[in-house]
Every structure is written in structure tokens, then in C-alpha cells.
């Protein structure tokens, strides 16, 4: 794909983001944190990086100084990830961590550009069983994750790179709105 078409695809995906849903997600996360709960985020590959970026903006700060906010990325503890993958299966690397760390009222975000990452789906299922509010960040058709999470923010693109760019855009939008509440 040439550069102009790539930019056009990114612009189209950005214009098709559901702003009302994004505002609702920011409100849900803010409310959970204000109530003493936390945000838990996970994904694979570039989505793992997005999960860590999201958490860094909340535990550090985004655009203004504020207190650190309770957020955990389940993609950072390589010992836990590799032990779970080795002893059980890579399919449960997030669900086992969710079972250990989540409590009712937490918000759990699973990021998967295809919506079909088995370990992300299993992590969301575990979070729902615990009583967490679950959110999927997806692309393409939303995949299987769309039918599992309480709500889905789907990027209207089939290009993984564009989906990832829009996920980080959405994460920044959410962090900016959360900043205003704390």
C-alpha cells in the first residue's frame, strides 16, 4: 500500500471511531477507580505494548499532574507469563492472572486486533465470572471477543497497523478524559 492510501485508511478509521462509546469507557474506568477498583489490561504483541502504554499513562501521568491511578498490565511479568504458559497453556496466561488479581467492580480491557486471540478471550471470560466490567478493543469484524465482552470498541479497518494506531489513539483519548476527573 502506498503512503497516500495508508494515510487515507488511517483517516477513515479515525473518523469512524465511536466517540460516545469512548466517552462511556472513560467514565466507566474513572468511576471504577474512584470507587477503589482498578483497571486491568492485556493483549499480545503490539497489543501488549498498548496495554502497558495505557497503564503507564494512568500510574504515571498523562497530560497533567495528578495522583497515580490503580492500573495493571498483565503483560509485564515474564516469570508469571512463562510459568503459566509452560505449566498450563499460553491460552490461560491472562485468565490465571485475572483470577489472582481481579475483584468484582474492576474494569478489564482485552486488546486483540482480530478479536480472536484465545488467551485474551479466556482472560475476559474469567473477568466476567469474577464480576468485572469487561471491554474488548478489537478491529476487523470484532471476532469472537465481540460476543464475550460486556462491550466492544471496534476499529473499522482490516489492517493490523491501522487498528493498533487507532487503539493507541483511543487510549490517549480515554487518558485525557480520566485526567480531567482526577
Curated annotation (Swiss-Prot):
It is an enzyme of class 5 (isomerase). It catalyses: 2 D-sedoheptulose 7-phosphate = D-glycero-alpha-D-manno-heptose 7-phosphate + D-glycero-beta-D-manno-heptose 7-phosphate. Pfam families: SIS_2. One of its GO terms (molecular function) is D-sedoheptulose 7-phosphate isomerase activity. Its EC number is 5.3.1.28. Pathway: Carbohydrate biosynthesis; D-glycero-D-manno-heptose 7-phosphate biosynthesis; D-glycero-alpha-D-manno-heptose 7-phosphate and D-glycero-beta-D-manno-heptose 7-phosphate from sedoheptulose 7-phosphate: step 1/1. Gene3D superfamilies: Glucose-6-phosphate isomerase like protein, domain 1. InterPro entries: GmhA/DiaA, Phosphoheptose_Isoase, SIS_dom, SIS_dom_sf, SIS_GmhA/DiaA_subfam. It is found in: Cytoplasm. GO terms for cellular component: cytoplasm. The keyword Nuclease does not apply. Substrate binds at residues 44-46, 57, 86-87, 112-114, 117, 164. The reaction produces a racemic mixture of D-glycero-alpha-D-manno-heptose 7-phosphate and D-glycero-beta-D-manno-heptose 7-phosphate. Catalyzes the isomerization of sedoheptulose 7-phosphate in D-glycero-D-manno-heptose 7-phosphate. Belongs to the SIS family. GmhA subfamily. This is Probable phosphoheptose isomerase. It comes from Thermoplasma acidophilum (strain ATCC 25905 / DSM 1728 / JCM 9062 / NBRC 15155 / AMRC-C165).
Amino acid at each position: 500500500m502506498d503512503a497516500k492510501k495508508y494515510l487515507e485508511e488511517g483517516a477513515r478509521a479515525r473518523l469512524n471511531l465511536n466517540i460516545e462509546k469512548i466517552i462511556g469507557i472513560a467514565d466507566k474506568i474513572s468511576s471504577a477507580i474512584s470507587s477503589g477498583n482498578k483497571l486491568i489490561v492485556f493483549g499480545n504483541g503490539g497489543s501488549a505494548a498498548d496495554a502497558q502504554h495505557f497503564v503507564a499513562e494512568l500510574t504515571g501521568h498523562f497530560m497533567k499532574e495528578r495522583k497515580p491511578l490503580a492500573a495493571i498490565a498483565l503483560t509485564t511479568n515474564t516469570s508469571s507469563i512463562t510459568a503459566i504458559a509452560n505449566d498450563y497453556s499460553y491460552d490461560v496466561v491472562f485468565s490465571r492472572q485475572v483470577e489472582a488479581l481481579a475483584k468484582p467492580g474492576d474494569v478489564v480491557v482485552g486488546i486483540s486486533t482480530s478479536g480472536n486471540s484465545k488467551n485474551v478471550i479466556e482472560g475476559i471470560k474469567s473477568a466476567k465470572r469474577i464480576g468485572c466490567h469487561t471491554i474488548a478493543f478489537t478491529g476487523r469484524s470484532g471476532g469472537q471477543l465481540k460476543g464475550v465482552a460486556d462491550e466492544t470498541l471496534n476499529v473499522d479497518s482490516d489492517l493490523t497497523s491501522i487498528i493498533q494506531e487507532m487503539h493507541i489513539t483511543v487510549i490517549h483519548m480515554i487518558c485525557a478524559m480520566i485526567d480531567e476527573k482526577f
